[in-house]
Amino acid sequence: ESESNQETEEDKFNRVDILAESDKGELTIIEIQNNRELTYFHRMLYGVSKAITDYIDLGNDYDKVRKVYSINIVYFELGQGNDYVYHGKTYFRGLHNTSDILKLSVRQNQKFFGFGLADGENVLERKEAGDLFPEYYILRVNDFDRIATTPLDQWIEFLKTGSIAPDATAPGLSQARECLRIDTLSSAEKNDYVRHMESIRYQRSVLETRRDEGFV
């Protein structure tokens, strides 16, 4: 599902939604957002909630509720913080013993994750109750300002600059590098690529201007 097929000036402020399903039935929402949105956190929550309800049939048992990952690639200052990658996860932590994290029972562990006794050990690989709940990742692309040394950083550098370093080895970047060979693109693909790069450049310019004017 995509909302990126706009041919107007608003194209530079578009967002792209991708919904992927793993072989385990888990859902991953990938969203790219260029323009500032005050209620973006709420929209993240809404998107995950909608995916959960859309992908369970009426009358299904609750154990058919899907695990959902929400990956949000944003080109604006979302929230306030010093990092450029954030991970949100649910924890059920004891109020009186804060080191006590609620785990699934043995039966729940086996039913929902299929885990038995760990190989060669008389212990069960126990999942936390929070592992059943959605997880969120936020990549604040414009805040990335370091040398890319990890696969994740290499991808973020690509998302920020639109170029891939010759020594980048992150999975998937070799395919992306091929797609960036402009001379092999069709006329329509070249136009899409140029418009995308112009969108990134324009949004970065707007953000820097707002910073200079004290709005950020």
Where are these regions (language model features)?
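Elongated, amphipathic alpha-helical interaction scaffolds
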Residues: 1-216
